[in-house]
Amino acid sequence: MSEEQRLNRARFRLAILKEMRAVHRQRQDTWGLKRDKLAERMGMDEARVSRILNGDEVLTIGLVAEFFHALEAHPTIRAELYEQIESCWRKWHAGIDAALGEKP
């Protein structure tokens, strides 16, 4: 994999994470999933979960996987989470197409 491909993958992952954080902030009450419950599911303290969701902690791929696992177990979240990922994926591809001068 070329350096450019690695960079693009990293950008995409970061975009997904940002989208997840934004959605979590917007939907926390709607989902009925509080930070204490999320912390419990992830086996972390609530302060760390708050730092992660607020963007104050560096995210790793492993941490992202933990979040997906914890959030996916909540039935109300699953559909919205995948919808946000798909939306992010479409935006990312549209950006690449535009950069290459291609029409979607």
What are these regions (language model features)?
Residues K37-E40, A65, H69, Y82-P104:
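Intrinsically disordered, low-complexity tails and linkers flanking structured cores
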Residues M1-D29, C88-P104:
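N-terminal flexible/basic segments that precede or flank functional cores
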Residues Q26-S50:
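Short alpha-helical DNA-recognition segment
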Residues G62-R78:
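DNA major-groove recognition helix of helix-turn-helix/homeodomain DNA-binding modules
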